[in-house]
């Protein structure tokens, strides 16, 4: 009996040990995802607003004799920087061409495009536009001595455009049979016209008025190529926060008639006496066709 007892006790003890579970290891708390910084906070942390502008398209964006960016669009961008960051100098300008405006937004090279970009259905699919700040129509510039009198005369001529502009898109869609000569930069297109490589240059009318005013011997055809359309700043598709901030800024600036000040400084001198500023600028972002 004693032998049996001695054998049973260890076996019973082993069975107890086998039935015991190891203490459960404490579960690690799930990491709480850090909330993504807002886009405006990202700009503030960076300390500067990055804006795509033209460098050769007066009166909107150009480089002056001091090597500084100036113009209607660039001054508006500086005001944005001042109101967002407290200092208009906290801005970085990136030179863009018409065809690079959208890619620069999509690749995050810039926060904002302020480069005379006309709002079109095709562009709306690629970027988000804010409320408009300007209105524009496409017209054509020809030498004073040119036999071209109307837009219809261009059907038998060579029309110069800058790649990616509204004029380029409009002619491609509406007159695919016209002979069109394309250049990447506005300055290259104007030089090509001066050199006689084409008969006319189709571009936003305010740009052409500026050129004709400074360069005697050219005239702008009175007819428009297409309808009048809004021009607006643009942000990357989906950047609702920055878009809404710009809309609020445009509304606030409208109360102080800020765009009228820029119009008087950069645009008025290029237009005929008596031109209504509201035919060019859109104060407060309120578009009225």
Regions found by a protein language model. Give the residues of each.
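Extended ligand-binding regions for polar small-molecule ligands
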Residues: 21, 30-34, 75-83, 163-165, ...
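Short helix-initiation/N-cap motifs at beta->coil->alpha
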Residues: 36-37, 91-103, 146-147, 181-191, ...
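Short glycine-rich His-centered loop
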Residues: 48-71
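Acidic, polar ligand-binding/catalytic clefts
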Residues: 78, 82, 90-153
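Periplasmic-binding protein-like
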Residues: 55, 134-142, 205, 209-250, ...
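A ligand-binding cleft/hinge motif common to bilobed small-molecule-binding domains
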Residues: 100, 116-126, 170-173, 187, ...
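Ligand-binding clefts/hinges and TM-proximal coupling segments of bilobed small-molecule sensing domains
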Residues: 26, 166-183, 220-221, 251-289
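C-terminal motif of bacterial Sec signal peptides marking the signal peptidase cleavage site
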Residues: 16-19
